[in-house]
Amino acid sequence: MNLKKTKMIRMGALVTAFTLASIGAATTASAKPSGFPVVDKQKATTLTIHKHVGDEKFGKYAGEQRIEKDPVVGVEFTVTPVLCELDLATSDAWKTISKATVESASSCVDRESKVVKTAEDGSVKIDLPQGIYKVEETKSGNNLVSTKSAPFLVTLPMPKGDNEWVYDVHAYPKNKLTEPGVPTKTASEPTKFVPGAEITWTVKASIPVLQLPYESIVITDQVPAGLTFKEVTSAKIGNETLSAGTDKADYSVANGVITLTPAGLEKVNSAMAKASESMPVEVNLVTTVGMDISTTGATTNKVTLTLNGKESEPGEGTTVWGNLIVNKVNEKKELLDDAVFSIYAGKCEAVTSRSTPVVENLTTKGGVIAQKLYVGKNESDSKDYCLKETAAPAGYVLDPVGRTVTVKAGKDATELIEFENVKVEGPDLPLTGAQGTAIMVATGLLLLAAGAGTVYVARRRNA
């Protein structure tokens, strides 16, 4: 019997009966000179679906089993009995079957469909009664299916050649798969230049347009030490803005993991039906800078995009911080406590009385202050700061001249500066003030005492 090859249309191909996806058979029989015998209604029939990556081809049923590479695991197929009124043992049935298409073949009222999934080897075997079935790929599982297999019709048993029935039928529908792209991640300038600052990160990616709906979309912010995940401020896929915190939220967030809910997936899949090759993704999230932020090289913040269980290579963004150490000393290089400093962004010549300090009231303990400061987004960056003393230690004069310090990124981004104070000591003066008068009074009292003693001794002698 000649089987016609029909035109396959994407997302709903019309396939004539039995021009199957490279269908093979488990058993073969020796050639016979006569035509087809009557179908043995007592024989059990099976259908084995083999799902692999590749280009799909349709043609006459050849009855060959093949060993295929690249199995596709977890793909769901729905097998639906159709044209149940036909008796495959009659020639009239085969006249109807030869003209049947996937769309025209009516489902059976009193028989249910079977839903099956491919195993680790990409195959699934189904025991089915003799009859005609429509086979459709209905879910992708943990796969990104850019081209799904076309639906097809199969009879159990299946005619092979000119005179043979095959009761154990094997079909080889193929997929074209794709992979998630690598996302990018860019840091904005922090809200302030010291720990406690917040940094907004912009994550961008694109998700491919699939022929089957997305079953899961997850964005994972892999927050490093020194940063703490705070919140997601916005999320958008294609032209769809995703919302959170409502009764029907589009995504949930837990410890930096952003997971689309069924409502969010519905939005994405609806938008995908109108898209071409890919849809842009943009998520803005916020982290807080901790006191433990590293000052030895860049702090790298990674992000991954997981589509239907397939995780992308991580994308990453960086933020760089340095450490400014100030030693407060006197002329003898002795460390001084209780000096108070403020730090301003930029060079000192640009700092005015109206400038707001980055940090203030830094007081030396053990003669030292240490302050972590923002440098930039890359390890090649540097940033200028102005260090100003606002109160000198007791006994020392305030130094009003600021010091411009350039904090650079690097393996050791520590800048050390000595800030010297002069002790207040006036010159020696003649003792003409109260101190001199006191000395003269004391001398006079001594002379009076000596005179009184002399008079007393003289009177005793004359007595």
Regions found by a protein language model. Give the residues of each.
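Solvent-exposed loop/turn and edge beta-strand elements of beta-rich ligand-binding domains
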Residues: 2-463
